[in-house]
From Swiss-Prot:
Functional description taken from the UniProt entry: Endoribonuclease that initiates mRNA decay.
EC number(s) reported in the record: 3.1.-.-
Organism listed in the record: Acidothermus cellulolyticus (strain ATCC 43068 / DSM 8971 / 11B)
Keywords: Cell membrane, Endonuclease, Hydrolase, Membrane, Nuclease, RNA-binding, Transmembrane, Transmembrane helix
Protein's recorded name: Ribonuclease Y
InterPro entries: HD/PDEase_dom (IPR003607), HD_domain (IPR006674), HDIG_dom (IPR006675), KH_dom (IPR004087), KH_dom_type_1 (IPR004088), KH_dom_type_1_sf (IPR036612), Ribonuclease_Y (IPR017705), RNase_Y_N (IPR022711)
PANTHER family recorded: RIBONUCLEASE Y (PTHR12826:SF15)
Membrane topology of the entry: Single-pass membrane protein
SMART domains: HDc, KH
Domain KH: residue ranges: 181-247
Any one of the GO BP annotations: mRNA catabolic process
Any Gene Ontology CC annotation: plasma membrane
HAMAP family: RNase_Y (MF_00335)
HD domain: residues covered: 307-400
């Protein structure tokens, strides 16, 4: 029963709220006396008061909502008006922009027509002429810049190259001895020559047959000569003959025994020389066959220069230059040390020693850059790597410096003498000095005989005669010095 009463009360309150909303929305309801209002059936006094309070609260909430809606509607109306004004303003600006663009196009066209009438050129022709002018100017500026860069690069390259080569030469100092292609064996007396020849020449024939070396016995006192194109065979024969002379027993069987022992001794010396060379250069891990061939070069000479010493010197020079250029020196030194390895077999295999050496290095597992440095050091193959170029440079420095080879030293001295002879033959020349290893010729002339103009003529004539008569690397600078001195004494 209480639940039913509560439900009826809620329904009554809801109906009352709806009625109040309708009255507020559509008009005021006629005033009703409090006495005319009947309480819902079954609703007590307290319940009616509570319902009345709820109705008042609902009415207040509705009024607040209506006020907020009205304020929002007012704001929306104001925003709409503002947007409409902005749209009208944008339309006016667009219209003004269109007029300005049209005026600008008209002015540009009038300017173009005026320029064409003034210059006598169409717009396309003027544009092409301007582009050509700018292009030519840019090319000229670029050419000047390139020329300046090339000049600076050339000067820097020459300076750096001279510095590198000079540093390498200064840091490498090696002794060179000019060796002959003929070995001399000294004898305790001339009677030993007869024992070497033997009865009916059997000893000398056996010696030459076993060793492959020509034994020359002439009128030279207490000495015999050994001649052979193979320096290793000649060295073996020299050691064998010295042992035979010391022993005193000389006959074909003894010659054969001593030759075999001498051959083993020379092979040990070659092996030791090769190992010393590798140790001096700082190279390891080389194939034993290459080491053996390298040792054979201990007894080979080229223009009087020992080949093994030349290889060690070349390796040091190449290593120093590689270090200056921040390149791995080990690879460069390896190629430089082996660049003449083909000379150990050049008479046994057809081909040049550079190509033979390259094939040997390739066969025994050397790096391809090392192989290329060997085959390209005489330009039989075009150098493609910096290692090959450094090997060429080091080889030229080692073999080309004065004193390294007899033939180059003789030609060097002859060239200097000829330079001085050419300059001394001119009238009025007092002194001549060949300086800087023959790269500069300084000529002192008599000031009373030669004037300034004649000095220039003499310098030009000497230079032309040198070009005609001499062959020389690089260039030779001819400087004619004419000096006049006047002196007085104050008493």
């Amino acid at each position: 029963m209480p639940v039913l009463i509560a439900t009826v009360g809620v329904v009554a309150v809801a109906a009352l709220v709806i009625a109040i909303f309708v009255v507020i929305k559509f008009g005021r309801a006629p005033r009703v006396d409090a006495g005319n209002v009947r309480q819902p059936s079954g609703m007590s006094g307290p319940d009616a008061a509570a319902a009345e309070a709820e109705i008042r609260e609902a009415r207040s909430e509705l009024e607040r909502r209506e006020q907020r809606l009205a304020e929002r509607e007012a704001r929306l109306d104001a925003e709409h008006e503002r947007l409409a004004a902005r749209e009208r303003q944008l339309a006016e600006l667009e219209e003004k922009l269109g007029r300005l663009q049209a005026e600008l196009a008209q002015v540009a066209e009038e300017r173009r027509l005026l320029l064409e009438r003034t210059a006598g050129l169409t717009a396309e022709a003027a544009k092409a002429e301007l582009v050509a002018l700018i292009e030519n100017q840019a090319k000229r500026d670029a050419a000047l810049t390139v020329r300046e860069i090339e000049r600076a690069a050339t000067e820097e390259a020459e300076r750096r190259a001279r510095e590198i080569v000079t540093t390498a030469i200064q840091r490498v100092a090696s002794e060179q001895t000019a060796e002959s292609v003929v070995s001399v064996v000294h004898l305790p007396g001339d009677e030993m020559k007869g024992r070497i020849i033997g009865r009916e020449g059997r000893n000398i024939r056996a010696f030459e047959s076993i060793t492959g070396v020509n034994l020359i016995i002439d009128d030279t006192p207490e000495a015999v000569l050994l001649s052979c194109f193979d320096p290793v065979r000649r060295e073996i024969a020299r050691v064998a003959l010295e042992r035979l002379v010391d022993d005193g027993r000389i006959h074909p069987l003894r010659i054969e025994e001593v030759y075999e022992a001498s051959r083993l001794e020379v092979e040990r010396l070659c092996q030791r020389a090769a190992e010393d060379a590798l140790l001096a250069v700082g190279i390891t891990g080389m194939h034993p066959e290459l080491v053996a061939l390298l040792g054979r070069l201990r007894y080979r000479t080229s223009y009087g220069q020992n080949v093994l010493k030349h290889l060690v010197e070349t390796a040091h020079l190449a290593g120093v230059m590689a270090a200056e250029l921040h390149i791995d020196p080990q690879l460069v030194k390896r190629g430089a040390l082996l660049h003449d390895i083909g000379k150990a077999l050049s008479h046994e295999v057809e081909g040049s020693h550079a190509l033979i050496g390259a094939e040997l290095a390739r066969r025994y597992g050397e790096h391809e850059d090392v192989v290329h440095a060997i085959e390209a050091h005489h330009n039989e193959v075009e150098p493609r790597t910096i290692e090959a170029v450094l090997t060429q440079a080091a080889d030229a420095i080692s073999g080309g410096r004065p004193g390294a080879r007899r033939e180059s030293l003789e030609s060097y001295v002859q060239r200097l003498e000829r330079l001085e002879e050419i300059a001394s033959a001119y009238e009025g020349v007092e002194k001549v000095f060949a300086m800087q290893a023959g790269r500069e010729l300084r000529v002192m002339v008599l000031p009373d005989v030669v004037d300034d103009i004649q000095a220039q003529v003499i310098a030009r004539d000497i230079a032309k005669q040198i070009e005609t008569e001499l062959t020389y690397p690089g260039q030779i600078r001819v400087t004619v010095v004419r000096e006049t001195r006047a002196s007085e004494f104050a008493h």
